UniProtKB/Swiss-Prot annotation:
GO cellular component terms attached to this protein's record: chloroplast thylakoid membrane; cytochrome b6f complex
Membrane topology qualifier: Single-pass membrane protein
Protein name: Cytochrome b6-f complex subunit 8
Tree of life domain: Eukaryota
Assembly description: The 4 large subunits of the cytochrome b6-f complex are cytochrome b6, subunit IV (17 kDa polypeptide, PetD), cytochrome f and the Rieske protein, while the 4 small subunits are PetG, PetL, PetM and PetN. The complex functions as a dimer.
SUPFAM superfamilies assigned to the protein according to its UniProt record, in alphabetical order: PetN subunit of the cytochrome b6f complex
Function: Component of the cytochrome b6-f complex, which mediates electron transfer between photosystem II (PSII) and photosystem I (PSI), cyclic electron flow around PSI, and state transitions.
Disulphide bond pairs: none
Similarity field: Belongs to the PetN family.
Localization annotation: Plastid, Chloroplast thylakoid membrane
InterPro entries recorded: Cytochr_b6-f_cplx_su8_sf (IPR036143), Cytochrome_b6-f_cplx_su8 (IPR005497)
Transmembrane segments: 6-26
Any Pfam family the entry gives: PetN
Amino acid sequence: MIRMDIVGITWAALMVVFTFSLSLVVWGRSGL
């Protein structure tokens, strides 16, 4: 159970980082 929780947290963190970096690239190309 603990391992599954770690995997879930890792996936959630990955999605947050991916979304953040993606929005950062979009903002950079927009000139903001």
